[in-house]
Amino acid sequence: MNYPGHGSPRSSERNGGRGGDGAAWELGSDTEPAFGGSVCRFDHLPVGEPGDDEVPLALLRGEPGLHLAPGAEDHNHHLALDPCLSDDNYDFSSAESGSSLRYYSEGESGGGGSSSSLHPPQQPLVPSNSGGGGAAGGGPGERKRTRPGGAAARHRYEVVTELGPEEVRWFYKEDKKTWKPFIGYDSLRIELAFRTLLQATGARARAQDPDGDHVCGPASPAGPASSSVEDEDEDRVCGFCPRIAGHGREMEELVNIERVCVRGGLYEVDVTQGECYPVYWNQSDKIPVMRGQWFIDGTWQPLEEEESNLIEQEHLSRFRGQQMQESFDIEVSKPIDGKDAIHSFKLSRNHVDWHSVDEVYLYSDATTSKIARTVTQKLGFSKASSSGTRLHRGYVEEATLEDKPSQTTHIVFVVHGIGQKMDQGRIIKNTAMMREAARKIEERHFSNHATHVEFLPVEWRSKLTLDGDTVDSITPDKVRGLRDMLNSSAMDIMYYTSPLYRDELVKGLQQELNRLYSLFCSRNPNFEEKGGKVSIVSHSLGCVITYDIMTGWNPVRLYEQLLQKEEELPDERWMSYEERHLLDELYITKRRLREIEERLHGLKASSMTQTPALKFKVENFFCMGSPLAVFLALRGIRPGNTGSQDHILPREICNRLLNIFHPTDPVAYRLEPLILKHYSNISPVQIHWYNTSNPLPYEYMKPSFLHPAKDPTSISENEGISTIPSPVTSPVLSRRHYGESITNIGKASILGAASIGKGLGGMLFSRFGRSSASQPSETSRDSIEDEKKPVASPPMTTVATQTLPHSSSGFLDSALELDHRIDFELREGLVESRYWSAVTSHTAYWSSLDVALFLLTFMYKHEHDNNVKPSLDPV
């Protein structure tokens, strides 16, 4: 990481226009204030300073009274307050493309001190050129950026001095994409840590390239005013570049700079190494961070650190203290055609021309660029307009503490299913897609809420050992790729049904859930006190494991009870008198032993409470593409005669159970028929399309029959198959041609060959389960009857499905309804192949905006309880 160089104290002219009285932040100077201690916690305020109710702006303004690093001198008398960080009328709007990645400051980094919630700006800044233009700008009539604060903020830019902390912007890069800016709150705190590092080290290292050669040498004479650069001190030209010079490890040993919590508290930035690390999960790919000082016009992408540092040093050495233009808010700058460069600076592969103090252009020195520049200049075009790239000093929007995130009041643990062994880290990417979709929905539908929902991935598979490599050693070599794919995906189902390895899978997920919750609470100590809620989103097999953890279901214990009952029923037909006498004594002894055990267990239960499997209560349990219903049916769960969720998941364990599935997902099954059997003939609730206007709340949607009877008092075998429309405000279409295509969204998220294999298998089952895709209205009644057979209830709990009281409109009578609907179905697309959907639908939930809206609707539901109840009449 390159760092700006040293300089003399700021000229009083910079602050003269606003009544300043001294030098402000000075990069690398001996009069620089020291900021020791923690970065993530604002714990440096002396006695009598503002506490929890005020933001410690002194950290960024350098106010007197700050604690200094050991051995540092107090030079606070040199520092002046910067009004841009305290002005009540200061306007700010983040230009960060990912600015919706929010977090809150209370309890950051292990539960440090808190800062008050700041009032949002009244008028957002809309830069005049942030959305247009290219990297190579600078032609006649080029539009310029607008600083916040209007003309009143102009005075602090009259004189060229070092960039203030609010003008610098820090960036990060993920997946080798473009640089993304941190929000203002994060950028200011990273800059604070960076300046703390500068003050604590006091080093003057020379930047070197990987070969050990200096890259920050004196500038080559390239213009009329460049000769004086050679007389500059070497350190002034090079600046402070410890990480690039290879001194990062040495600094880390000598100076302990605490990492800065950023991006909603999900990541931490290490300014010593110049990298960003996730907090709650492991990630092999490094996320570099960069300090931006000079930016490309139009895109506002930062220049590379080496070049930016050199240009900044040259700019300060040449123009320090000089007057800038009269007004910074000029909408259109004067064309530079015909202007001669007043200063030039040679870089390794480029050179920079200054046409004025704030008109700077970057040119490539590649041979092709030189030829093109020569040709265009002969055609009458200026050098800048033909091949120059306009540069800006300082970011388009200044960083402010007001640009801070909302408070997290709801966390969502995202649990993966099978296939993670084959594609480790996939759940992290899937959670990132779900988080990004949720941010878009929050900005669109829940922007007026002061709270925030955060998604955390739960990766439990990679830490398990299971059988080691035993299965791999017995796998034949033929079609090895397909076999390895099955071993890495479908084998997880075999492991979970095995009594030997099932406990390892359950404990692996249970420990990871508790670890993440404990870590989150340690970094957010007020989460539980303020009533924070926890939900779980599970996919595929993860739904079954999560369910068993919450309910404590253990097949080994049930098997032991079954064996015990069988032992108590021996065959007495061929027993002698002596054998029967001994058997009676054995029964008496066992009964006495059982009574003693029960008394002992009772004493233990009264003296200590049983530790729950999870350290938190689950508010909502969302199942996506879940086979949970099949597992419950095979365990003997049969429909009851009440419509309560407690029949399969007690409310004291989980407040709400919701089952989300795509109609063609071959792995997903319905849960409602396990509670009330006749719900197999009631259509699942259709999930609203994310851009549906004024959708009816789900709790007010009446259930409708899949096959409504002609006779309103009975359901015959030759019943019609027309679908009664659901009471939604969207246009009434058939269920197959209604709403968003989840498959189209999911084509980009086919999770490897394992998912394709599962999808192909599901496609074959779908082929035999349906007559054809060209006859969607003839959804086989035989297949429905076949699905009813394995879950047929005993005679004592059977709910009659031949005489169901319902209204003439085709809706079920409320006496036989569920307390809350559980099955929610995504809508199929207008143009969609069911065979292709069978391949892709199981992995298409992560990026769906429909799913994101559905999740957030129930998580924010407690804030909508006071809304006016809409009409219950069917649409």
UniProtKB/Swiss-Prot annotation:
Q: Which InterPro entries match?
A: DDHD_dom
Where is it predominantly found? cytoplasm
Q: Does the keyword Signal apply?
A: no
Residues of the DDHD domain:
614-861
Compositionally skewed regions (Polar residues) per UniProt: 795-804
PROSITE patterns, alphabetically? DDHD (PS51043)
* Pathways per UniProt: Phospholipid metabolism; phosphatidylinositol metabolism
The UniProt entry annotates the active site at S540
E.C. number(s) listed in UniProt: 3.1.1.111, 3.1.1.32, 3.1.1.118
Q: Which Pfam families match?
A: DDHD (PF02862)
Q: Which residues carry this modification: Phosphoserine?
A: S8, S11, S726
Location of region: Disordered: 1-30, 101-153, 206-231, 770-804
GO biological process: any one? phosphatidylinositol metabolic process
Q: Cellular component per GO? A: cytoplasm
Q: What are the recorded GO MF terms, alphabetically?
A: metal ion binding; phospholipase A1 activity; phospholipase activity
Which reactions is this enzyme annotated as catalysing? a 1,2-diacyl-sn-glycero-3-phosphate + H2O = a 2-acyl-sn-glycerol 3-phosphate + a fatty acid + H(+); a 1,2-diacyl-sn-glycero-3-phospho-(1D-myo-inositol) + H2O = a 2-acyl-sn-glycero-3-phospho-D-myo-inositol + a fatty acid + H(+); 1-octadecanoyl-2-(5Z,8Z,11Z,14Z-eicosatetraenoyl)-sn-glycero-3-phospho-(1D-myo-inositol) + H2O = 2-(5Z,8Z,11Z,14Z-eicosatetraenoyl)-sn-glycero-3-phospho-(1D-myo-inositol) + octadecanoate + H(+); a 1-acyl-2-(5Z,8Z,11Z,14Z-eicosatetraenoyl)-sn-glycero-3-phospho-(1D-myo-inositol) + H2O = 2-(5Z,8Z,11Z,14Z-eicosatetraenoyl)-sn-glycero-3-phospho-(1D-myo-inositol) + a fatty acid + H(+)
Tissue-specificity statement: Expressed in mature testis.
- Result when mutating S540A: Loss of function
UniProt keywords (A-Z) are: Cytoplasm, Hydrolase, Lipid metabolism, Phospholipid metabolism, Phosphoprotein
Instruction: Output compositional bias ranges, type Low complexity.
Output: 217-228
Protein's job: Phospholipase A1 (PLA1) that hydrolyzes ester bonds at the sn-1 position of glycerophospholipids producing a free fatty acid and a lysophospholipid.
Q: Which family does it belong to?
A: Belongs to the PA-PLA1 family.
Task: List, alphabetically, the PANTHER family matched.
Answer: PA-PL1 PHOSPHOLIPASE FAMILY, PHOSPHOLIPASE DDHD1
Indicate the quaternary assembly.
Forms homooligomers and, to a much smaller extent, heterooligomers with DDHD2. Interacts with SEC23A and SEC24C.
**Name this polypeptide is given:** Phospholipase DDHD1
Q: Which organism is it from?
A: Bos taurus (Bovine)
Please name the gene that encodes this protein: DDHD1
